[in-house]
Amino acid sequence: HATVEFEGVMPQSSSIKLHRVALVLPSVTIPAKGTMQFGNGFLIDMAVATGTLSVPSLPEWLAKSGLEAGNIEVSLDVKGKEPDWKTWRVTGWMGLTNGLMLVKGIDGHLQDFYARVKVARNEVEFKQLSFKIQGSDVAIEATVRNWMAKPIITGKIESNQLDLSLVIPKGERTPIREFLETVAATSHVTMAVAVARGRYKHLKVGSLAARINIQDGMLDIDRLSGESTHGYVAGRLVVQLPPNAPADFDL
């Protein structure tokens, strides 16, 4: 169970002003300081700083979101003049270290998950986002604009070792297919990709570079270049991602 503690004043019968609010959980307390006013006009101007929190000490609903282990730290400033939280201006940063995460639409855990995220009102900046999945390592730097509506995501992806069958299906569907479907249906993504060592079935490719565009149910990998034991690789790959069906791709 959880309780909320608060301190404040009632300067007049029609309003309440709080200057400290704390969410008290069985093993951790999350404090917020500043001003929160109800009644005679709404106002929030508060700072939340958690310190380092161990994921197992947090509520069960967080584990249900897929995060199973790691350490989280959050520092946010929240300002607003309307009760609707979607209108509030949120700035600050969030960090995750040593994370273990299960993401809907991806087969297998994301391991050694590290993230440092800078938050602004309509923009989220992933300063660092790295993890390992099924023997591959991925590091991402990206900016997400318009994240409250249809996100526009730009940035770069780097990998020392990547199994390309995570993206290009060997059978009917890839291990991250459902996740890609969701992204392609809800977002617009443009990412530069650099892979030191890539593999697909029996093909090994070095110094692989490409640009990925994802939108409107389609994954478009262009400006594709690399070196294999059979020579130079170049081309473009367009993958249609119909929900719950095999991918249709042109090479």
How should each PLM-predicted stretch be described?
Residues 1-5, 9-17, 28-124, 136-222, ...:
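Membrane-proximal interfacial segments on either side of biological membranes
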